Amino acid sequence: MAETLTVEVMFGGGAELLFNKVKRKEIALPPLKTFLPDSQNQNWTLKELLIWLKDNLLVEREELFLKDDSVRPGILVLINEEDWELHGQLNYELKENDKIMFISTLHGG
């Protein structure tokens, strides 16, 4: 069976408030088929990472972070400091030691 996949997730711009004020966390993802046996993918993608975050780290108001199977509009996603749109968004296949940042660009007044 495959080993765990270690990635670092970071939250900023207020998104950290949805994750118990955690700004940075290194996580060891289990083999994908262990976490999601029915997944069509063989390897972790950002889509599965969002499910894992929802199930394991998200503690406040899911609707402020997720919409359907993606992040809510107004959440900027960076993969190793580059816009996720350059990497296929939800289809990006996670690699060991990737750094995934979620930044809220919406602020109340």
UniProtKB/Swiss-Prot annotation:
Pathway: tRNA modification; 5-methoxycarbonylmethyl-2-thiouridine-tRNA biosynthesis
Post-translational modification: C-terminal thiocarboxylation occurs in 2 steps, it is first acyl-adenylated (-COAMP) via the hesA/moeB/thiF part of the MOCS3 homolog, then thiocarboxylated (-COSH) via the rhodanese domain of the MOCS3 homolog.
GO BP terms in the entry: protein urmylation; tRNA thio-modification; tRNA wobble uridine modification
Keywords: Cytoplasm, Isopeptide bond, tRNA processing, Ubl conjugation pathway
Predominant cellular place of this UniProt entry's protein: cytoplasm
Residues with PTM 1-thioglycine: G109
Compartments where located: Cytoplasm
Glycyl lysine isopeptide (Gly-Lys) (interchain with K-? in acceptor proteins) crosslink site(s): G109
Keyword Cytoplasm applies: yes
Residue intervals passing through the bilayer: none
GO cellular component terms, semicolon-separated: cytosol
Domain of life of the native organism: Eukaryota
Alphabetized Pfam families for the sequence: Urm1 (PF09138)
PANTHER family: RURM1 PROTEIN (PTHR14986)
Family membership noted in the UniProt record: Belongs to the URM1 family.
The protein's role, per its UniProt record: Acts as a sulfur carrier required for 2-thiolation of mcm(5)S(2)U at tRNA wobble positions of cytosolic tRNA(Lys), tRNA(Glu) and tRNA(Gln). Serves as sulfur donor in tRNA 2-thiolation reaction by being thiocarboxylated (-COSH) at its C-terminus by MOCS3. The sulfur is then transferred to tRNA to form 2-thiolation of mcm(5)S(2)U. Also acts as a ubiquitin-like protein (UBL) that is covalently conjugated via an isopeptide bond to lysine residues of target proteins.
Name under which the protein is recorded: Ubiquitin-related modifier 1 homolog
Native source organism of the sequence: Bombyx mori
